[in-house]
Amino acid sequence: MKLTILFLVAAVLMSTQALIQHDGEKSQKAKMKFLTARTLSAKKRDVDCVGWSSYCGPWNNPPCCSWYTCDYYCKL
């Protein structure tokens, strides 16, 4: 009887571990997809960005490069 209970507990623990490990793989893949998409969008934005002392006002509003801020002109 005790041996049967021990086997059942071991089986439950092993199946729980397998489920947790499988979910970890899914979340790792999702994380990689998210980071890849974010990197690609950042690269796309850098192509469209304007550099230092470029006009970025309300009528013509291209994004400043990530290290600049826009206050009518991109500035550090």
UniProtKB/Swiss-Prot annotation:
Disulfide bonds join C49-C65, C56-C70, C64-C74. The keyword Ubl conjugation does not apply. It holds the Pfam family Conotoxin. Its main location: secreted. GO terms for cellular component: extracellular region. Expressed by the venom duct. It is found in: Secreted. One of its GO terms (molecular function) is ion channel inhibitor activity. Keywords: Cleavage on pair of basic residues, Disulfide bond, Knottin, Neurotoxin, Secreted, Signal, Toxin. The keyword Magnesium does not apply. Residues 19-42 form a propeptide. Residues 1-18 form the signal peptide. The presence of a 'disulfide through disulfide knot' structurally defines this protein as a knottin. Belongs to the conotoxin O2 superfamily. This is Conotoxin VnMEKL-012. It comes from Conus ventricosus (Mediterranean cone). The lineage of its organism: Eukaryota, Metazoa, Spiralia, Lophotrochozoa, Mollusca.
